[in-house]
Amino acid sequence: MLERIGISLEDGLLEQFDKLIAEKGYVNRSEAVRDLIRDALVQRAFTESSGREERVAVVTLVYDHDSSSLAQKLAHIQHENHRAVVSALHVHMDAHNCLEVLVLRGRGKDVVAMGESLVATKGVKYGKLVPATAGHDLR
């Protein structure tokens, strides 16, 4: 069941929003607003959980594989937390740089700790932990 709501926006904000949703390919404002709300709910659930609930996240890493034992350190962290690693994708971007994308799933505090550990590993050029969802609580 859908409920209709109304919102008020400052001058120019609606114009910017319409441009954004057109660029992203949304067919209407409603679907774009629903996606914004879903994203906010996922973020809140991830950050406000007790840490015991199951959570899903994606970690993106870019690093120089020639960097002194960095690849081994990253692999070690993954092996220490192997139950949380659902999937790992490793891409050779060029002769030196690697892109690694990991899907993590487990207790929230464990997922966050592992993701932050990977991102903070010395030598990682870019790292990001992005909360995701298994979709159970979303409509």
Curated annotation (Swiss-Prot):
InterPro entries found in the cross-reference section? Acetolactate_synth/TF_NikR_C, ACT-like_dom_sf, Arc_rbn_hlx_hlx, CopG, CopG/NikR_regulator, Ni_resp_reg_NikR, Ribbon_hlx_hlx, TF_NikR_Ni-bd_C
Binding positions (Ni(2+))? H79, H90, H92, C98
Molecular function (GO) terms for this protein are: DNA binding; DNA-binding transcription factor activity; nickel cation binding
Highest taxon above the source species: Bacteria
What cofactors does the UniProt entry give for this protein? Answer: Ni(2+)
Q: Alphabetically, which GO biological process terms does the record hold? A: response to nickel cation
What is written in the cofactor note of this entry?
Binds 1 nickel ion per subunit.
UniProt entry keywords in alphabetical sequence: DNA-binding, Metal-binding, Nickel, Transcription, Transcription regulation
**DNA damage keyword on record:** no
Range of residues in the leader sequence? none
Q: What Gene3D superfamilies is this protein classified in?
A: ACT-like. Chain A, domain 2, Met repressor-like
Q: Does the keyword DNA-binding apply?
A: yes
Q: What Pfam families does the entry give? A: NikR_C, RHH_1
NCBIfam families the record matches: PRK00630.1, PRK01002.1, PRK02967.1, PRK04460.1
Q: What does this protein do?
A: Transcriptional regulator.
State the family named in the UniProt similarity comment for this chain. Answer: Belongs to the transcriptional regulatory CopG/NikR family.
What protein is this chain from?
Answer: Putative nickel-responsive regulator
Q: What lineage does the source organism belong to?
A: Bacteria, Pseudomonadati, Myxococcota, Myxococcia, Myxococcales
